[in-house]
């Protein structure tokens, strides 16, 4: 605990942007609001290495005698770096006190565009097209004068002596608390749920044909039927239908419950009329103990709920209020001990201890042997039926897509009815796949794909829940781990003699990639670590603090660098990537410049939408930067065709491999798996299938298409290191399922599942180099 004398650092709550710093007398650093406050001049000789990182206490002679190249290719070192650094870093982020209330940083591309349109409509102005957006004058940044003290010139942490210089573009939305696009200003019922059109009854009135609205309760005229008029209500009471009162809205405004995006399984007719209240995910007993009224957690199981009591009106009124987060002091202290006091082994995952990992597979099998054996035997006995069902579901999905493409609603609805009978968000991989694709086809058929996708993006899922789901995915899937090891090892090899390393990260998000690199830099040189500069680039968040998320990432990395005695400087940029100028990056002479991106270029629009595409604009920007090395990791997919049926088939093949991978590694009832599939894969599928034009932001290309694009942009490819490729293959073969593939094609590192390529990484330099 000695490394945190002032307690465990929070995030924005502990930042005082107007506070003067008491600097240690031994340091020669200078403080300037314009140029920033850096760690390179600090004297760290008086700092004791933290106990949480025993590698810092190794004998200096051992470190001095290590060859850098030999240490870099150590198989156990790479695994330890990732497990002890990245997963611990994720757990540390989860432990921040206000993480439950923060918005997620993983996805917001289309929500930003929709919020901009809404702002222009509110101002009575016309929203500019994407091609002319850069030439339009925008309102001044509010971050510099924010009443909470945030500023675009510099963001200071009074715990770690560092500064993050922030550049926040004016292309962000000022939506206050609940900004919605114009088409979301029309209220939707709280029981908004995907429903098969041929099986559903009217959600609100209990009568009417299911073909009247695709979702049971939709937009426009269908919404009017959800709100009883006085004469209709009187007629219902005369008939003695007391159940009608249950469907009346209890407040003056209906709200969107996007969690109802998951349709019910067999009891959809009964559940369709229920109104669920958004609450924190806690045990049912804890809800009653703290007087937090909520229905039983049966939304994912599809079981009929009998939760109705006298306080229902009060609960439904409370559902429109912001939920309060309550954590007992003893529980918080215990979690602090687990994250801060850890031994030389791998740290314990404190927030999701039961998630399955490769190393814990044997222990899990021993403790739950009977249950797991039963599942496997059941799966084996029905293997032939599963294969037949998979083929049938894929055929039905393709036929349904063809019917939707020609607006054959009768055939499409019949196909959807058959798909619904054999699909479920809790089933096997093919059933889950069919469930999300059926949802997307329904959305496209109703013309509400953009609304649903943006509602899912605007949904108030806490960053903590999203990080837990992401952590579960990282623990069982080697794709991103291998890409991070490939990029970090290449950086270490290229920067062996550099005094200053400047990493420009497009899509830094929470910065999961960099703790392992920082740890390696601290041990790489006997004379001390080189200075590390990171420019974190992200899209602006909604609200009055568009750069808050990317700034907090810088503060976490600064604290990590301070513990490892690595001089550090951070520059935060929150704006549309195609509008960034070279001057915003603050390049300096003599530094080794590395441009990095981890699977985020797929969200940039291409030339099929705009002549001057953002995808080419970003590549031109990188070429102007003239980096020493450019390391892109891309999602290799072919579902970017403008023709719907072709795109649908390719997306179906791609996500079939992804869902099959999750099904083989994670339990079907795993809550984190459910959340990850819904929040990541489910949203992506909705965007690919149900959105068009600029609203379709999921636009992956194959690695061969990216190779041609990068060559046109003025780059040439570097060969891969044979020893690194061999080590990565050994790691995957020995530590993960045999169906994970790692291969090399030309100068590309390819990763896939059962022969289908999913991700690719490579090294590039400017052609003139």
UniProtKB/Swiss-Prot annotation:
It holds the Pfam family GRAS. It is found in: Nucleus. Residues 593-687 are annotated as: PFYRE. Its main location: nucleus. Residues 1-23, 128-157, 279-320, 364-388 are annotated as: Disordered. Residues 391-451 are annotated as: Leucine repeat I (LRI). Residues 552-584 are annotated as: Leucine repeat II (LRII). Residues 384-765 form the GRAS domain. Residues 470-536 are annotated as: VHIID. A motif (VHIID) lies at residues 501-505. Expressed in roots, shoots, flowers and siliques. Keywords: Nucleus, Transcription, Transcription regulation. Residues 690-765 are annotated as: SAW. GO terms for cellular component: cytosol; nucleus. One of its GO terms (biological process) is positive regulation of DNA-templated transcription. It comes from the Eukaryota. Probable transcription factor involved in plant development. PANTHER family: OSJNBA0084A10.13 PROTEIN-RELATED. This is Scarecrow-like protein 14. It comes from Arabidopsis thaliana.
